[in-house]
């Protein structure tokens, strides 16, 4: 194994992890198209224009061939061409090719638009296929509602972004919620956080990520600078032989993470300190006087209440998990409802990873009527995760009916 940074401080586990990560051709971790340079305001502008050209969630026909192969639009694509021209003029992104091949792919995976094939059948946003029509989804309509306040828009964006990143936003929230880190730097985000619960061989749990970040913080300022400077000078494509998968590119890696990092600015659970390049979890001990997110303040009460009511102790390898993710909240009231001990469960790292990687689709709580030690997390299609007390979770079985009722109250509540 090639050592890039381990020699800067022999025995430091965080540096060893970085070198191990760089052995993988997937070292960059989570990937977003670098062409998709959008933020929440641009997203709202584009979806508003889509609503203008395809009102009332009607289907708009899009081009299915690259402009280089067929420069002209057919008559049925006129609305699409006009829409793309207006989007490009307003936001500086969204050519006809980029819109259908990049932006619409993201927006569909975020749940903000629906895509349809040539038979007008809804397609799976995470599977490849030819798309001929698009339309705003119910969530997309809600996001562009001019009567909706900005905080509620940010909450919807958070939920949508978590879907796009297959649970990554929730993982970051879990990392800062269940540890004493309180904040993370961009370098820590790129080197360690982006490896959480990914589908590559260097995947780490939130607990392992916390440990690596703390180990990294034991380095002196000079050593940390040496790590980044070394990676910048060593990870240059021309320094490597072979094809693309054999090469390493620091700037490409950093740019991809910067794109994801920037999107966190619109997530109301965090504060982005641009000057210091830090991402901070909003908690009761953060001074929010200079921010507009005071309604999203979190306290330790829900966590403390869980351990008090369930009479369990903290154990290595387990972490508190929101049964219904906080990212499901679409208003401050919903957020406060979900930030409660009755919406928490102390589960093991493996179960948390499965739940997170699924995009947190398992949020319906149920249990075995004959054995309260056996509970389940279901998704809307009936698939389930089996949870056993004193094994994959730690809880007081007598609290199970109350947790179930609390869960059902939210799930069955009518939404506007």
From Swiss-Prot:
Can you cite a GO biological process for this protein? DNA restriction-modification system
Among its keywords, does the record have Protein biosynthesis? no
Q: Which cofactors are required for activity?
A: Mg(2+)
What reaction does this enzyme carry out catalytically? Endonucleolytic cleavage of DNA to give specific double-stranded fragments with terminal 5'-phosphates
Known EC number: 3.1.21.4
Which UniProt keywords are given for this protein, alphabetically ordered? Endonuclease, Hydrolase, Magnesium, Nuclease, Restriction system
GO: which molecular function terms? type II site-specific deoxyribonuclease activity
User: What's this protein's name?
Assistant: Type II restriction enzyme MboII
According to its UniProt entry, this protein's organism is: Moraxella bovis
